[in-house]
């Protein structure tokens, strides 16, 4: 990461730097390109008059955000121009994981292919049955440790840059047995961390619960409708304003 001059002093449009899981770029029928105007990061960017750098992947936790912020050269390039940073993760952290995350993520590397398919199918059978009693993918204290490591590293390179974090979304996914008992402990841990470090929070549940629980999202029961994306964008703009970001309309 770099501590070079910010966009305000170079004449470039500021960048909204978003670290995210798939909730930020999936719609009601599947994944979308990072520049799709219907997903919340681009709705927010349009309202602010900013560019957007969306760095994410399906299944990412707050631990992956740390790795992306410190190892992905896109984040190094975006940070000097960033007007604000959003941590749009924590949902995967709070979902049940019958296998330890490291083992689950190694399934993709199993060889030969027939064995990988067998292991994946087996895990797909086990996951919804064991999810109601499984631990979260990341313990809440580990989630906030990675959030703080990332926030501190970003603040070291860009002192005082506005940062907004997120509380977990909700789901009705049969693949997880509709279980989400890890959400409340994760919410409590992130809330305490955010209060300590004065980080505004966006409660994704508040934005999307009606759509998700009403069955109006993606059929997988996890990802959102475009109406939910618009609701997230609205709350994200409020969180950014709380962090000190001025919207384009209010600045004129």
From Swiss-Prot:
GO terms for molecular function: diglucosylglycerate octanoyltransferase activity. Its EC number is 2.3.1.273. The keyword Transferase applies. InterPro entries: OctT (IPR050023), SGNH_hydro_sf (IPR036514). It catalyses: (2R)-2-O-[alpha-D-glucopyranosyl-(1->6)-alpha-D-glucopyranosyl]-glycerate + octanoyl-CoA = (2R)-2-O-[6-O-octanoyl-alpha-D-glucopyranosyl-(1->6)-alpha-D-glucopyranosyl]-glycerate + CoA. SUPFAM superfamilies: SGNH hydrolase. Keywords: Acyltransferase, Transferase. It is an enzyme of class 2 (transferase). Homotetramer. NCBIfam families: DigluglyOctase. Belongs to the OctT acyltransferase family. Sugar octanoyltransferase likely involved in the biosynthesis of mycobacterial methylglucose lipopolysaccharide (MGLP). Catalyzes the transfer of an octanoyl group from octanoyl-CoA to the C6 OH of the second glucose in diglucosylglycerate (DGG). DGG is the preferred acceptor, but to a lesser extent, GG (glucosylglycerate) can also be used as substrate. DGG and GG are the two earliest intermediates in MGLP biosynthesis. This is Diglucosylglycerate octanoyltransferase. It comes from Mycolicibacterium smegmatis (strain ATCC 700084 / mc(2)155) (Mycobacterium smegmatis).
